[in-house]
């Protein structure tokens, strides 16, 4: 692996501290307190993609650059196993992944629409935005996005944005430790590459 540019690594550290923690995470926490539910959920999805720019590739990378960035962070969240299960189930049902439904539709339609096309018919898997995801099982980790049944037993997808913020904060803290304290080469290389993307407009 080539030698890490120390100046760019410092720029990446500054970006993590000033913009990711000081701006993005702080904005999400303020938005949570202000109860701007849909705006908070949208911020979680958009910031997941931005954070992913600074993280190493995962085993199964999408050829779509933006989707790849999203999943580099999304699949590193604390509840990644449940999120991968949900993503696979949605892909199997709709031929599209969660990124294509939730991230795209929240940004462009301001609603987390999940569509399933069957011939000329367009069916919708219900989805809702909620502040909290709560489990009846003590100490269970409730992922930021999950399947749930509504009052009449219909399956829906829930985006629980307090859970999402909590897991993003953990991811950012862990990534900073791996990058700037434990000096893991793949994390440092990705952080430096992320600086080129975000601050210099390079492609990655």
Please state what every model-predicted region is:
Residues 2-23, 27, 94, 110-204:
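Polyanionic, low-complexity intrinsically disordered segments
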Residues 13, 32-33, 87-88:
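Residue-level detector of alpha-helix boundaries and kinks
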Residues 17, 33-40, 91-92, 96:
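Aromatic-acidic/polar surface patches that form glycan- and anion
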Residues 30-80:
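Short, contiguous, well-structured surface segments enriched in hydrophobic/aromatic residues
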Residues 71-105, 109-117:
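Short, mixed-charge amphipathic alpha-helical segments
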Residues 21, 25-28, 68-71, 100, ...:
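Hydrophobic core segments within long, regular secondary-structure runs in both alpha-
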């Amino acid at each position: 692996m080539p030698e890490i540019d120390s100046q760019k690594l410092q720029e990446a550290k500054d970006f993590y501290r000033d913009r990711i923690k000081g701006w993005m995470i702080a904005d999400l926490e303020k938005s949570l307190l202000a109860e701007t539910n849909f705006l908070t959920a949208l911020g979680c999805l958009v910031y997941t993609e931005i954070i992913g720019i600074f993280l190493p590739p995962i085993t199964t990378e999408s050829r779509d650059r933006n989707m790849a960035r999203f999943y580099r962070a999304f699949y590193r969240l604390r509840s990644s196993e449940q999120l991968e299960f949900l993503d696979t189930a949605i892909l199997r049902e709709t031929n599209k992944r969660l990124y294509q439904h939730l991230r795209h539709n929240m940004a462009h339609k301001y609603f987390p629409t999940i569509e399933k096309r069957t011939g000329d018919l367009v069916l919708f898997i219900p989805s809702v935005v909620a502040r909290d995801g709560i489990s009846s099982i003590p100490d269970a980790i409730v992922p930021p996005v999950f399947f749930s049944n509504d009052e009449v037993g219909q399956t829906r997808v829930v985006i629980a944005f307090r859970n999402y913020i909590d897991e993003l904060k953990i991811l950012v803290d862990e990534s900073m430790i791996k990058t700037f304290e434990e000096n893991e080469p793949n994390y440092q290389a990705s952080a430096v590459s992320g600086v080129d993307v975000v601050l210099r407009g390079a492609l990655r």
